[in-house]
């Protein structure tokens, strides 16, 4: 989300008129690997089965230590009272395991989990069909819950609070409301935009938990486990090499592992060493900091054309040919996380770390902005 200021905004800074003031190593020509480092589910992943590599129990789930402790207490308390779990809202960047957690909760409670997403619930009857078919204690997982239609969301209010479905029959003065009892269930909502949820919906969740990015050591454990399930030989140092470039995201880590596995099977008789992993990821344009071709291009344009910034989002979008929303939602979060980009009231600024990573030397006048 762009940072706004109540003060009058200055005009966009003009492109640097003194290109000699920046030492320019340039961006090597390359064809970016489309979608390899995005945390969104790829079409290939939608078609393939991922259940085989998902952890089935909370004890097998790597990372998110505080979240696991909270959920373990909630599970044990619910089991002792023979009640369903409280409704749970999970928020955070995509690819961190929200769907996996909902499936684990259902497995721990010994119930079924129904998985859907808000865009699939276009009409009120879609959510009604799901709710009336739930069994006592079942888990209903709704991904991208911030995108629920208004009428669908309003149907969830009594369902979540009183396990009741209120259906309006007829129109105008002849309209009447009929209430249908629902079995007690647990709603698990997932969102990347918790601020976009309405207060009435957010307030009906008994547990609200944030998922954080993973440390390289945690991702390394996930990669080693996945490699074992895929019957792939992988050294611990190779797993850590892949983990460092995975943007703190398990989905990306598993995706990179599969691409490295393909490379190793063709080029190195199937065994993945640190050297093989590094060569494969270099081929796929994933650098040691987890930046891909597009990430580096965004920073390079800011540095070469605008002296590192500040520069507006729309200007960056026009200069790179990317949509402003794509830059803001897909590329910027990781650049902000690793400290390569700053958002200021005047625009985006490439940090000193970004200059050094790309091999540039900032001019003296720019150091005050970094």
UniProtKB/Swiss-Prot annotation:
Membrane-spanning regions, if any? Answer: none
Question: Which residues make up the binding site for DNA?
Answer: 343, 348
Q: What is its EC number?
A: 3.6.4.-
What are the GO BP annotations of this UniProt entry?
Answer: DNA recombination; DNA repair
Reactions catalysed according to its record: ATP + H2O = ADP + phosphate + H(+)
Disordered: where is this region?
Answer: 1-53
Which superkingdom?
Bacteria
Please give the function described in this protein's UniProt entry.
Answer: The RuvA-RuvB-RuvC complex processes Holliday junction (HJ) DNA during genetic recombination and DNA repair, while the RuvA-RuvB complex plays an important role in the rescue of blocked DNA replication forks via replication fork reversal (RFR). RuvA specifically binds to HJ cruciform DNA, conferring on it an open structure. The RuvB hexamer acts as an ATP-dependent pump, pulling dsDNA into and through the RuvAB complex. RuvB forms 2 homohexamers on either side of HJ DNA bound by 1 or 2 RuvA tetramers; 4 subunits per hexamer contact DNA at a time.
Assembly information from the UniProt record: Homohexamer. Forms an RuvA(8)-RuvB(12)-Holliday junction (HJ) complex. HJ DNA is sandwiched between 2 RuvA tetramers; dsDNA enters through RuvA and exits via RuvB. An RuvB hexamer assembles on each DNA strand where it exits the tetramer. Each RuvB hexamer is contacted by two RuvA subunits (via domain III) on 2 adjacent RuvB subunits; this complex drives branch migration. In the full resolvosome a probable DNA-RuvA(4)-RuvB(12)-RuvC(2) complex forms which resolves the HJ.
Description of its domains: Has 3 domains, the large (RuvB-L) and small ATPase (RuvB-S) domains and the C-terminal head (RuvB-H) domain. The head domain binds DNA, while the ATPase domains jointly bind ATP, ADP or are empty depending on the state of the subunit in the translocation cycle. During a single DNA translocation step the structure of each domain remains the same, but their relative positions change.
Name of the protein in question: Holliday junction branch migration complex subunit RuvB
Organism listed in the record = Cyanothece sp. (strain PCC 7425 / ATCC 29141)
């Amino acid at each position: 989300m762009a940072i706004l200021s109540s003060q009058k905004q200055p005009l966009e800074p003009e492109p640097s008129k003194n290109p000699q003031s920046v030492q320019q190593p340039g961006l090597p020509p390359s064809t970016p690997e489309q979608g390899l480092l995005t945390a969104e589910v790829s079409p290939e992943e939608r078609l393939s089965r991922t259940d085989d590599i998902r952890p089935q129990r909370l004890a097998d789930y790597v990372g998110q230590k505080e979240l696991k402790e909270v959920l373990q207490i909630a599970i044990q308390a619910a089991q002792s009272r023979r009640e369903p779990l409280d409704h749970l809202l999970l928020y955070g960047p995509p690819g961190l395991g929200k769907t996996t957690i909902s499936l684990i909760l259902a497995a721990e409670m010994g119930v079924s989990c129904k998985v859907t997403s808000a865009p699939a619930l276009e009409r009120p009857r879609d959510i009604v069909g799901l709710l009336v078919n739930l069994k006592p204690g079942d888990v209903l997982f709704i991904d991208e819950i911030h995108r629920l239609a208004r009428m669908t969301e309003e149907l969830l209010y009594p369902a979540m609070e009183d396990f009741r479905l209120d259906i309006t029959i007829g129109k105008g003065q002849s309209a009447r409301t009929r209430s249908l009892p629902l079995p007690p269930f647990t709603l698990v909502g997932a969102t990347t935009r918790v601020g976009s949820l309405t207060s009435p919906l957010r307030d009906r969740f008994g547990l609200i938990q944030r998922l954080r990015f993973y440390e390289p050591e945690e991702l390394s454990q996930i990669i080693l486990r996945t490699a074992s399930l895929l019957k792939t030989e992988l050294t611990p140092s190779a797993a850590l090499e892949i983990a460092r470039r995975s943007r703190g995201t398990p989905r990306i880590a598993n995706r990179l592992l599969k691409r490295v596995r393909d490379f190793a099977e063709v080029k190195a008789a199937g065994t993945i060493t640190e050297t093989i992993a590094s060569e494969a990821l270099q081929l796929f344009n994933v650098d040691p900091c987890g930046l891909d071709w597009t990430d580096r291009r965004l920073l390079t344009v800011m540095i070469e054309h605008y002296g590192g910034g500040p520069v507006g989002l729309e200007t960056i979008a026009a200069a790179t040919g990317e949509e402003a929303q794509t830059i803001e939602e897909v590329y910027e979060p990781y650049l902000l996380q690793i400290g390569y980009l700053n958002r200021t009231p005047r625009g985006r600024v490439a940090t000193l770390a970004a200059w050094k990573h790309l091999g540039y030397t900032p001019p003296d006048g720019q150091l005050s902005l970094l």
